[in-house]
């Protein structure tokens, strides 16, 4: 088997014009693996540390030369000579080398860049697609490959846009499609329908970080209304063909045990119970199938009530709540909180820990949703990971911006390659709603 002969990190620029880490891993057989690390806007307080330089004279303090140096000077010497297929060992060595709970010594961006680049190098060396290679090295057993339902973020609010919409993401899920290809087509058509609707109403059609529109709408409900119109303009039926998903990012709205929603006409300040009632009211009006981070990451008592009241009607996703961390996630499972976990590779900082979080979800009867970050690159590995691990759902933005579309295009290629060995589950992908 091929061994690592060289690891090289560098500073590149992400989709928001900020620096990020890219890593090359070169093997003895000449194979190269290259990976770039994403970055979030709204981040959970317990996420693995993204190491930044802090030099205000350079990229406003957001440079990543320290992380790059850690790749080249600390990590590379420890991994050179190792067999590339020993991914778990490679990740364990880096985790031990860092020695902290949140990778605050080496930086999660340094560790993750190396981890993902090793996986790509291994797949290339073994002449396997990344999705197949990941299954092989982690012994993932499944007869079928599942293509994920795209949760397409077509209206951006909150931290992802400069407007008065409180909720961070309004997403559409094309559930009636027979294949991923058709689902993506449906999503693109609704996206274009929404642009037409917004233009006719005199709203701006500039896009946010994740490629969705960021109009200055009057309320959160109005965002759902214009999406309903867009679905009809595209020739689809709301609730049958297209259902909705929300990312509230409620931690960003939470202060002094209360939630403030500036976009609401009545009762801008809400308690946990008020928020749960607010979601209940939205469910009466709109076909919402999933709500992510509906309450703050620190409001576990509220989450318990939210789960008890709405788990039979909704997929309740923990993002900031669980931060792809198996220790935190296990605590949530034991306490009966949420019924789904968002999977972000850079929240935890290694491929092996990411796989462990997905496997923990399945054992507990939770769903797992593969996700991008608001700061992305041309790297499309999360598309492969969604298929490798059969997450059944993926969040990777709207139907614009190449940093988002490259993931969708990779899924198109994977579906074509797999043919009859793959399936698209549609509404059945939301299997934790019980």
Curated annotation (Swiss-Prot):
Cytoplasm as UniProt keyword: yes
GO biological process annotation, one example: glycolytic process
Pathway the protein takes part in: Carbohydrate degradation; glycolysis; pyruvate from D-glyceraldehyde 3-phosphate: step 4/5
Cofactor binding, note field: Binds a second Mg(2+) ion via substrate during catalysis.
KW Secreted (keyword) present: yes
Superkingdom, taxonomy of origin: Bacteria
Keywords noted in UniProt: Cytoplasm, Glycolysis, Lyase, Magnesium, Metal-binding, Secreted
Localization in the cell: Cytoplasm; Secreted; Cell surface
Catalytic reaction annotation: (2R)-2-phosphoglycerate = phosphoenolpyruvate + H2O
Active site (UniProt): 210, 344
EC number, UniProt record: 4.2.1.11
Positions that bind Mg(2+): 247, 292, 319
Gene Ontology molecular function, alphabetical: magnesium ion binding; phosphopyruvate hydratase activity
GO cellular component terms, semicolon-separated: cell surface; extracellular region; phosphopyruvate hydratase complex
Matching CDD domains: enolase
Described function: Catalyzes the reversible conversion of 2-phosphoglycerate (2-PG) into phosphoenolpyruvate (PEP). It is essential for the degradation of carbohydrates via glycolysis.
PANTHER family associated with the record: ENOLASE (PTHR11902:SF1)
Protein family according to the UniProt entry: Belongs to the enolase family.
Protein name: Enolase
Species this protein is from: Endomicrobium trichonymphae
């Amino acid at each position: 088997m091929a061994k690592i002969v060289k690891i090289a990190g560098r500073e590149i620029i992400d989709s928001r014009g900020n620096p990020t880490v890219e890593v090359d891993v070169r093997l003895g057989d000449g194979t190269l693996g290259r990976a770039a690390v994403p970055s979030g806007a709204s981040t959970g307080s317990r996420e693995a540390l993204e190491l930044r330089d802090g030099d205000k004279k350079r990229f406003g303090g957001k440079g990543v030369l320290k992380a790059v140096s850690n790749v080249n000077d600390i990590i590379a010497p420890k991994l050179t000579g190792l067999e590339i297929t020993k991914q778990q060992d490679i990740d364990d060595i880096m985790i031990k080398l860092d020695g902290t709970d949140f990778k605050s010594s080496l930086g999660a961006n340094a560790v993750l860049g190396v981890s993902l680049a090793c996986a790509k190098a291994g797949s290339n060396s073994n002449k396997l697609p990344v999705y197949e290679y990941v299954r092989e090295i982690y012994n993932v057993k499944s007869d079928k490959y599942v293509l994920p339902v795209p949760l397409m973020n077509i209206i951006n609010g909150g931290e992802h846009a400069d407007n008065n919409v409180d909720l961070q993401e309004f997403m559409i899920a094309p559930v009636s499609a027979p294949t991923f290809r058709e689902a993506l087509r449906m999503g693109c058509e609704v996206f274009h329908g929404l642009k037409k609707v917004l233009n006719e109403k005199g709203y701006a059609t500039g896009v946010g970080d994740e490629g969705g529109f960021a109009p200055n709408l009057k309320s959160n409900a109005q965002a759902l209304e214009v999406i309903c119109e867009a679905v009809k303009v595209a020739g689809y039926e709301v609730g049958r063909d297209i259902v909705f998903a929300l990312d509230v990012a409620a931690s960003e709205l939470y202060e002094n045990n209360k939630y403030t929603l500036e976009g609401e006409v009545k009762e801008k300040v809400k308690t946990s119970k008020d928020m749960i009632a607010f979601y209940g009211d939205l469910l009466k009006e709109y076909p919402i199938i999933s709500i992510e981070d509906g309450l703050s990451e620190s409001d576990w008592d509220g989450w318990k009530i939210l789960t008890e009241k709405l788990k039979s009607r909704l997929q309740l996703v923990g993002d900031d709540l669980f931060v792809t961390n198996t220790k935190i996630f296990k605590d949530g499972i034991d306490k009966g909180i949420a019924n789904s976990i968002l999977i972000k590779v850079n929240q935890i900082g290694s491929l092996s820990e990411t796989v462990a979080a997905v496997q923990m979800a399945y054992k507990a009867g939770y769903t797992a949703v593969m996700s991008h970050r608001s700061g992305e690159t041309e790297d499309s590995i999360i598309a492969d990971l969604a298929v490798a691990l059969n997450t059944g759902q993926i969040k990777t933005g709207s139907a614009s911006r190449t940093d988002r579309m490259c993931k969708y295009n990779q899924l198109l290629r994977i579906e074509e390659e797999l043919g009859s060995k793959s399936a698209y589950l549609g509404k059945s992908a939301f299997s934790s709603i019980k």
